[in-house]
Structure formats: C-alpha cells, structure tokens
Amino acid sequence: MELKDYYAIMGVKPTDDLKTIKTAYRRLARKYHPDVSKEPNAEARFKEVAEAWEVLSDEQRRAEYDQLWQHRNDPQFNRQFQQHEGQPYNAEDFDDIFSSIFGQHGRHSHHRHAARGHDIEIEVAVFLEETLEEHQRTISYSVPVYNAFGLVEREIPKTLNVKIPAGVSNGQRIRLKGQGTPGENGGPNGDLWLVIHIAPHPLFDIVNQDLEVVLPLAPWEAALGAKVSVPTLKERILLTIPPGSQAGQRLRIKGKGLASKKHTGDLYAIIKIVMPPKPDEKTAALWQQLADAQSSFDPRQQWGKA
C-alpha cells in the first residue's frame, strides 16, 4: 500500500496555508470535473484531487497525514503500514490507519475544520457631489453557493441598504462584515467589500483632495481683470480675476475641494484664454490698434533673436 503525496497531487507545498490549498483544489476540480474535462484520465484525477482535499482541508487529518509522511521511510512504520496492503485506501480510512500505527495517544479527537467564507467585492459608482455628505445607497449583488467540489452551484441574489460616508475617495474600500459567502462547518461568513469608484465629472478633475476646473477667459478679461462666476460642487461663486492674468495660471479657491476626516481640499481655477471668432472689419481695426500700442511686446522673446 503506497502513501500518496497529497501535496504533489494538489500542486502545493507542505508549508502552504489552507487558502492556497483551497485555491489549488478549486482550480483542479474545475479542470478535471468529468462534466467539463475532455482529458482521458479526468475522472481518476478528479477523484484523486478530491481525496487529497478531504485530508488537507481538515486541520486534524492534515496533521496526522504530515506525521505519516514524515515516518514513511522508517522500517517500523513500513512494516505496520504494509499490514493495510490490499485494503481500499482513501481519506476516510485515515483515522484507522493512523490509530493502528501510532495508537490513540498520537492523535486528538477528530473534528472538521471550520473555514471562513469568501469575501465578495463589488464596485460602487459615486458622483463627486455625493462625496460631500453621507448618503444611503441600495445595492444588489449575488452570493455564490459552492458545492462539495468547489464549483459554484447557484447564486443567491441579495439587496442591502448601506451608508456611504462623506469624503469617500476613489478606490476606497468599505467593509460590510459577514455579508460575503457563508462559512463552512460553523466558520464565520466572509465580508462584502464596497470598492468606491468616483464617476468622471464633466467639469472637475481630482488631484488628491483638491479639484481643478478650467476657467475660460476672454483676452480682455485676462488683461484688464474681471469678476466671473465659477462653479463649485455646491454652488457658483464670484471669483476676482487679477489684471494681467496669464494662460495656465492657477487661482486658488480655498476650502472648495473634497472633504475628508482630516481636512478639506481646495478648488483651483486654471485660466484658459479663449479667442473670439474671426474678427469683422471693425474688430480687426481694434486689434490692430492694440498691436500698434504693444509693438515692443514680443511673446517669443525667450527664443532669442532670429
């Protein structure tokens, strides 16, 4: 009777944790499931993988197996182990084999391993305006139910009313404890994680806690200064444009950015000079007067003389 190398069958290492082994089992169970696999030895491999999982998934059985494996080359072990030659060998025989070799003192009472359920992640889209205050959101998602082979047997629809706190940021994760998949053998449920996705805004760009908005100005507004209406997340405000403002200049509007527990960011209005349409004869004459008055001004001075 040969002691099978369950770790090799699962493609894992003896030092791997249960989560890693479970991932390997599910991958192999899907690969060799007789209903989906076209490989000639699929059924035999599937049974072998299921047998390995039944031992390695149970904390006590895995400890017993590790002890058996450690002594597999000892002459005394081999003599006693060979007494089981010809008997069917599977995971359910494990307790009897271990007890006959090491005696009852070498093991504890058998118990099934309690395993925590899986976490579930869903993406929740939030508008920028919604980040200013806490708000309620109804979310719907599906909780997968796994069969004994680690395959999804069905999905249970679920709906929750949740609170989205003020000041959430893009990529932030909100944990809802116990709302994931059910645990196994009395283990705790997994959690539901809401991953916040801030929806793109037609006006504002996000830079950490700050916001940026492009502020279009006519050439004379930039040159002479002006008071213009600027949008914020809550309302429009009147912003003073200093004379001689330049394209690309950033005007800070304090406290009009995104809020968080620590501080509130600022809004930056970035000036963009917008030229009027092609001038008519009268407007062209005015532009010419301006050009004559500013004849010494060279916007390309940094290039040097030709």
Swiss-Prot record:
Which Pfam families does this chain map to?
A: DnaJ (PF00226), DnaJ_C (PF01556)
Is Cytoplasm one of the keywords?
yes
Provide the GO MF annotations for this entry: bent DNA binding; unfolded protein binding
Name the domain of life this protein comes from: Bacteria
Query: Could you tell me where this protein is found in the cell?
Result: Cytoplasm, Nucleoid
Entry keyword DNA-binding? yes
Q: What InterPro entries does UniProt report for this protein, alphabetically?
A: DNA-bd_curved-DNA, DnaJ_C, DnaJ_domain, DnaJ_domain_CS, HSP40/DnaJ_pept-bd, J_dom_sf
J domain: from which residue to which, for each copy? 5-69
Entries under SUPFAM superfamilies matching the protein: Chaperone J-domain (SSF46565), HSP40/DnaJ peptide-binding domain (SSF49493)
Single GO BP term: protein refolding
Q: Which UniProt keywords apply?
A: Chaperone, Cytoplasm, DNA-binding
Cellular component per GO, a single term: cytoplasm
Q: Which cysteines are joined by disulfide bonds?
A: none
Instruction: Please give the NCBIfam families that the UniProt record associates with this protein.
Output: PRK10266.1 (NF007618)
Role, per record? DNA-binding protein that preferentially recognizes a curved DNA sequence. It is probably a functional analog of DnaJ; displays overlapping activities with DnaJ, but functions under different conditions, probably acting as a molecular chaperone in an adaptive response to environmental stresses other than heat shock. Lacks autonomous chaperone activity; binds native substrates and targets them for recognition by DnaK. Its activity is inhibited by the binding of CbpM.
Under PANTHER family, the record lists:
DNAJ HOMOLOG 1, MITOCHONDRIAL-RELATED (PTHR43096:SF52)
Q: What is this protein called?
A: Curved DNA-binding protein
Native source organism of the sequence: Salmonella choleraesuis (strain SC-B67)
